[in-house]
Amino acid sequence: MAREKFERKKPHINIGTIGHVDHGKTTLTAAITMALAVGTGKSGKRYDEIDAAPEEKARGITINTAHVEYETETRHYAHVDCPGHADYVKNMITGAAQMDGAILVVSGADGPMPQTKEHILLAKQVGVPNMVVFLNKEDQVDDPELLELVELEVRETLNSYDFPGDEIPVVAGSALMALEALTQDSKLARGSNPWVDKIYALMDQVDKYIPTPQRDTDKPFLMAIEDVFSITGRGTVATGRVERGKVVVGENVDIVGLANIPQNTTVTGLEMFQKTLEESVAGDNVGVLLRGIQKDQVERGMVLAKPNTIKPHIRFESEVYVLAKEEGGRHTPFFPGYRPQFYVRTTDVTGKIDSFKADDGSDTQMVMPGDRVKMVVSLIQPIAIEKGMRFAIREGGRTVGAGIVSEILE
């Protein structure tokens, strides 16, 4: 069956929900898809369709990132519902890297919680430039003054992580009440239900406040591989988000990383949201069909790139901020020879920290939680690295630092 073409009529934005577990991220995502499907002939997504990652059912915790799409009058959105649970921050680091903006969901009944702060910090680290706040569960808050206090606390928290907390739009509402109303009557237009209207009000703010990003379309093509599938009779498909540049069916690409020498292949097809494309540009979440490549020759953590534009490296110098104990970082110092995981794009690679330098250029033998430091890192596997690239340092399931590559050494 021929797939229909993906039409590019509106600017495309990648967005996601972040916030503490059980504050209502997935419920809000479902309510947005249902509200924006009204009158379009499309259908929204139910809560259980978004929450459908296989491991979750036992614990009711979102683990995998769910991708949904919807449109406002001015834009097309791809929305990731980020995992809320601390153990799955690993997924958020790969998922949040996909966001041009975020909707921070905070329960108006509880206020900011530890994971709220962790997600704001992560958003800062992975470079999510803008966010809008949804104060959820307004129906459970009897005293309007209480909601105002929660809003103030959220704004202060955002300020403390260098987001413009005073100007970020905050919309209060109840995702559950809106979702229930839309489930009973899927044709509720604007103005017919106060709870549903709050969802529209939220999306109006997202449209207005989160700018359409300047895509890096003119730079050389690069896409970090998130997943690899084998399609019988057609070959191997690598999926991911195009980070920069564009790729056209028929072009050659290098597959770089986790090996010393890049592989070269030809792109034989492109698909987005199950529709075929002739070309794919920065910002697209896309599947790339690769000629003559076996499924076991590519894996998550490699990148597809324009030939000879990026090389695999194992050693680099970086500027790193080591999280303080209060931010969920380590409680004890670490020393040269420390071996944590380095998260780069979609990969986690073990690396050894060879040496540290203080801001004044002097060698230092010990790094305390809360320090900012220059460090030289040697990875155990080569991956596609370039100057200015961000990464996270993780250990035992938690983020202990965030950094940016300042020099490539080998």
Curated annotation (Swiss-Prot):
Per UniProt, GTP binds at: 19-26, 81-85, 136-139
One GO cellular component from the entry?
mitochondrion
Any single GO molecular-function term of the entry would be: translation elongation factor activity
Domain of life, per the record?
Answer: Eukaryota
Q: Which UniProt keywords apply?
A: Chloroplast, Elongation factor, GTP-binding, Hydrolase, Magnesium, Metal-binding, Nucleotide-binding, Plastid, Protein biosynthesis
The record's annotation in Pfam families points to:
GTP_EFTU (PF00009), GTP_EFTU_D2 (PF03144), GTP_EFTU_D3 (PF03143)
Q: For the region G3, what residue ranges are annotated?
A: 81-84
| CDD domains the record matches | EF_Tu, EFTU_II, EFTU_III
Q: Which PROSITE patterns match?
A: G_TR_1 (PS00301), G_TR_2 (PS51722)
Residues holding Mg(2+): 26
Q: Which residues form the tr-type G domain?
A: 10-214
Localization, UniProt: Plastid, Chloroplast
**Would you identify the family this protein belongs to, as annotated?**
Belongs to the TRAFAC class translation factor GTPase superfamily. Classic translation factor GTPase family. EF-Tu/EF-1A subfamily.
Q: Which NCBIfam families match?
A: EF-Tu, PRK00049.1, PRK12735.1, PRK12736.1, small_GTP
Q: What is this protein called?
A: Elongation factor Tu, chloroplastic
